[in-house]
């Protein structure tokens, strides 16, 4: 749906972030900032994985940013650390754009009365502002983000989270068609949760999967 590229290894990325934090009373040098960020990501991943050893887990990066900031300044609010998280994402993002035809497709589904939900492996503090900026939120009847659920595709628990989040919609697996461009996550979550699956080939699709899942007309 969205073509996005981020680079957290760009030469000045961590320097820019450290400079921003220092201006707001959170004193890191860039190397320490990167080191602590990576450490906290590992910490939260380990804690959640220990709690759910058999699941594909997804941490909430908002917790990482909050602890990262409060380690240096206990007066930092969650509002500030989330704002820093948005800056983190914006600085790391090389580009993001909607794939050709997505607006038309979603609009047509809406016009035909088809209910559309988004099941996304993502961080809410990154992705929700991007969806708003791209004008995509209005097309969906509901959105489930893995960082809010604590689980990610291909775990069936993430699909169950979506179904439970919108009980009034009476969503059940057999009523759903999962559409995605990554077989390992989208196809497998459909399989694990009992949904049908439509494979959408994109520039992210590995060549091996393109060949394996082509339709007969494409092969011809």
PLM-predicted stretches and their roles:
Residues 7, 28-31, 103, 107-110, ...:
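Asp-based, Mg2+/Mn2+-dependent phosphohydrolase catalytic module
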Residues 1-99, 111:
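N-terminal helical cap/lid subdomain that shapes the substrate entry/recognition surface
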């Amino acid at each position: 749906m969205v073509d996005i590229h981020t680079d957290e290894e760009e030469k000045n990325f961590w320097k820019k972030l450290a400079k921003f934090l220092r201006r707001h009373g959170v004193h890191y040098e860039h190397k320490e900032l990167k080191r602590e960020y990576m450490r906290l990501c590992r910490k939260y991943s380990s804690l959640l994985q220990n709690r759910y050893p058999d699941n594909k887990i997804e941490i909430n990066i908002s917790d990482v940013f909050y602890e990262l900031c409060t380690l240096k300044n206990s007066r930092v609010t969650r509002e500030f650390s989330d704002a820093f998280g948005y800056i983190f994402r914006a600085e790391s993002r090389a580009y993001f754009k909607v794939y050709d035809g997505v607006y038309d497709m979603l609009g047509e589904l809406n016009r035909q009365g088809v209910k559309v939900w988004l099941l996304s492996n993502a961080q809410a503090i990154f992705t929700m502002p991007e969806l708003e900026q791209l004008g995509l939120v209005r097309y969906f009847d509901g959105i489930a983000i893995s960082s809010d659920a604590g689980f990610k595709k291909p775990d069936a628990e993430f699909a169950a989270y979506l179904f439970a989040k919108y009980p009034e919609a009476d969503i059940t697996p057999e009523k759903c068609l999962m559409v995605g461009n990554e077989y390992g996550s989208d196809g497998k979550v459909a399989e694990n949760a009992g949904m049908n699956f439509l494979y959408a080939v994109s520039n992210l699709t590995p060549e091996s999967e393109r060949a394996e899942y082509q339709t007969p007309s494409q092969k011809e």
